[in-house]
Amino acid sequence: MTQEVDTVERAAATPGQPQPYRELGLKDDEYERIREILGRRPTDAELAMYSVMWSEHCSYKSSKVHLRYFGETTTEKMREIMLAGIGENAGVVDIGDGWAATFKVESHNHPSYIEPYQGAATGVGGIVRDIMAMGARPVAVMDQLRFGAADAPDTRRVLDGVVRGIGGYGNSLGLPNIGGETIFDASYAGNPLVNALCVGVLRKEDLKLAFASGAGNKIILFGARTGLDGIGGVSVLASETFGGDESGAGGHEAGGGAGPSRSRKKLPSVQVGDPFTEKVLIECCLELYAADLVVGIQDLGGAGLSCATSELASAGDGGMRVELEQVPLRAANMTPAEILSSESQERMCAVVTPENVDAFMEVCRKWDVLATVIGEVTDSGRLEITWHGETVVDVPPRTVAHEGPVYERPVQRPDTQDALIADTSASLPRPATGEELRATLLAMVGSPHLCSRAFITEQYDRYVRGNTVLAEYADGGVLRVDEQTGRGIAISTDASGRYTALDPYAGAQLALAEAYRNVAVTGATPVAVTNCLNFGSPEDPGVMWQFSQAVRGLADGAAALGIPVTGGNVSFYNQTGTTAILPTPVVGVLGILDNVSRRLPTAFGSEPGETLILLGDTHDEFDGSIWAEVTAGHLGGVPPKVDLEREQLLAEVLTAASRDGLVSAAHDVSEGGLIQAVVEAALAGETGCRIVLPEGFHDGTGVFVFLFSESSGRVLVAVPRTEESRFTAMCQARGLPATRIGVVDQGPEGGEPTVEVQGQFTVGIEELRRTSEGVLPGLFG
C-alpha cells in the first residue's frame, strides 16, 4: 500500500482533521450528526458511505415525509395481492396459478445527459438487476423518455445516444422492449428524463428478499470486477442541479462529444455497462435460486458496496464483517472509499450458508461468473469493514441505510399558479371548416408530439423470447407468462408533465387513469401500480408543493381504484440553473389476463365492416392539450376532469367484452383526442374508416370538440357487426355511455383506404402515414 489508510483507530486519534464532506454532498449538520452517531470523526471510508447513502437519491430525505402517504392510504384489501412492496428492490404481486410478477421503474436522468449511451444503457441494466434480486427472471422492459424540443441543437446528441443505449443493452440481454413514451418539450432541454421499467416473473415460492441473516453465513460478491466508474453517481450526479451554463453545449453527432464543459468533469460518475456480462449473471442467478443456494441477495447499483452491505446488514438480524481487500478490482491502487463508492455495473451480493458456498461457487464457475467470499454475517449488530487487517468502517448499519436525515422542506403553492390557471385555451382560434379541421389534423399528426415513434421503436427488439403478445402500436404491452394456460400480464406507463404543471394533484391522477385505461384496453384487469416521480429541486418550495400534491393525487387515485402502489422512485434536482422541468410523475400499471389469446389489439380491420363505438363522454377540454401546444405553443388553464369510477367501469366492460368476444379492437383516447386515436388504429390495421358526427356536435365548434378534445375516461372500440347489439346492451346495463360513431371501411377495391369525417373532410391513409412517419427520420435520421 502506497498511501496511509484512514482507520477507525486513526480517526479516533485525530478528531480535528479536516474532511471534504461538503464536496461529497453532505451539509454541515449532517456531518455533525455522523460524528455524534460514531462518537468521533468518520474515517474516509465511512464518510464515503454516509455521503452516498444519505444522498437525496438513496435516502429519500426530502420526499420520505410525503411518501408515507402511500402506506397510509393502502388498505388491507389492497395489500392482499402484494407479496413485496415499498422498501424492497421492486414490488411483487400475486398474478394467480402460483405465479407472481415483479415490476419497477427507475430514473437515470442526469447520467443520460452527460453520456447518453452509457447513461441509458446502465439505466436498463440497473433496473433489470433490481428485478433479478427479487428472485425473478426479467422478461421485458419499457421506457419513458423526455427530451428537449425536437429541433433544439442538443436533442439529436442526447436522443441518439439514449435510444442506442437502451436498444444496445436490452437487445443484448434478450429482453423485449414492449412499449413506453417519447415526449419532446423545451423544459427537458438540459435535463432529459430516462425512466426505465423492467418486469419479471417468478413462482411465488421463489421470492427472494434483501437481508443478511444467520451469524456465520458468508457474504459473496459475484459478477464483474470493481472499478472507478460511477463513483459519486448518486451523491453528486443524481442529487444536485445542473448549472445554468450547461445547456446546449457539446457535440451533436453520435459519439461527438460528451456534452457541456462542466458536465465533462462528471464523466467518471457515469457507469459503464456490459450487457453480455449481465446476461450471464441473470442465468447464473436463476440457477442459484433454483438450487436454493441463496439466503438473501442485493444488487449493486447506486452507492455500490456501500448500499449492498449496509442495506443487507440493516435489514437482517445481526451485523456484518467485510474484508475489503478480497473485492476483485479492475483498477490499481483503489482506496477503500473508492471501492465502497464504486458503481461498477453487473455485480450482485449474496448471503450464503457455509455448507452451500462450494455449490454456489460451482454454479458461478459454470457460468464463468467471478465470485469471491468477502465477509460474513455476525451477531455484533454493527457493520465492520477491514482493509488488510485494519478496520476502516465500524458503524451501526441502520444509521447508514435506513436512519438518514429526514427533511420537512417548505411547501408553497407558487405565486404564478393562479395566472397559469387563468390563462386558458378558450381564446385560441379554433378550426371551423372541413378544410381547417383537415389541416389541423395533419399539423398534429406531423408534429414531433404525435408523430410515429417507429424510428425509435424499430431500434428495439420487441418480440425476442417469443412471449410478447402486444407491443407495436399497442396501448399497453402484453406478455405470456405460462405457455400451458395462456396466463399473461399487461403493463403500461404514462405521464403528462403539461397537465401536472397546471394541477399536480389532477395531473398525477390523469397519468394513473391513462396507464390504468391502457392496461384495460388490452383486456387485462389492472391490479397494481409503480411510479417514478421526476421533479425539480426540493429546495424550491414551489417544487415541493408540486411534489406533495402529485403524491397525494396518485395515492388517493390508487386507493379509489382499489389497487396498491407497490414501490417507486423519486428523482429530484431535474433542472438547469433555476429552470425546472415540467413536473413529471411517471405511473406504471400492471394487469392480469387469464388467457392472452383474448387480448384486444389496437388495429382496426380484423373483422370486415366493424362498427366504431366511443365509450365515455366528450367535453370541451383543451387546456394543456397537444392541440394548444402544436397550434399556439400554449400551456395554461385547467386539465381535463378525472372520473376514477368511470375508469373502473370502463375496465370492467372491456374485460368482460374481451372475455366474451364482443370487441375486436380497443384504443385509449388521450393526446390528440378521438381523431388521433382513429388515425393510429387505422394505420395499425392498414384500413380506412368513416366517422359520423353524433348528435350535439354538428354546430359551431362542436365538430372540433368532438374530434380533438382530450377529455379523459374514453376508449374507442371496434365491434363486429354481429355483436353490436349485445355490446351496446351490456354498456347500457352498466351505465357506460356508448356512442356509435362510424364503421371501418376498406375503401373501393383497388383504391386507397381513407379516413373520412362525414360532411367535413377526407384524408388518405398513405398521406397520414407519410406525414406521421417522416417526422423523426427527418429530424434525427
UniProtKB/Swiss-Prot annotation:
Q: Which reaction does it catalyse?
A: N(2)-formyl-N(1)-(5-phospho-beta-D-ribosyl)glycinamide + L-glutamine + ATP + H2O = 2-formamido-N(1)-(5-O-phospho-beta-D-ribosyl)acetamidine + L-glutamate + ADP + phosphate + H(+)
Question: Known EC number(s)?
Answer: 6.3.5.3
Q: Which HAMAP family match?
A: PurL_2
Q: Which residues bind substrate?
A: S107, H108, N109, H110, R129, Q271, E343, S344, Q345, S571
What's the source species for this entry?
A: Mycolicibacterium gilvum (strain PYR-GCK) (Mycobacterium gilvum (strain PYR-GCK))
Q: Which residues bind Mg(2+) 2?
A: D130, D299
Query: Could you tell me which residues belong to the region Disordered?
Result: 1-23, 245-269
Alphabetical keyword list:
ATP-binding, Cytoplasm, Ligase, Magnesium, Metal-binding, Nucleotide-binding, Purine biosynthesis
Q: Where is the composition biased (Gly residues)?
A: 245-259
The protein depicted here goes by the name Phosphoribosylformylglycinamidine synthase subunit PurL
Name the Gene3D superfamilies on file.
Answer: PurM-like C-terminal domain (3.90.650.10), PurM-like, N-terminal domain (3.30.1330.10)
Taxonomic superkingdom? Bacteria
Q: Does the keyword Transport apply?
A: no
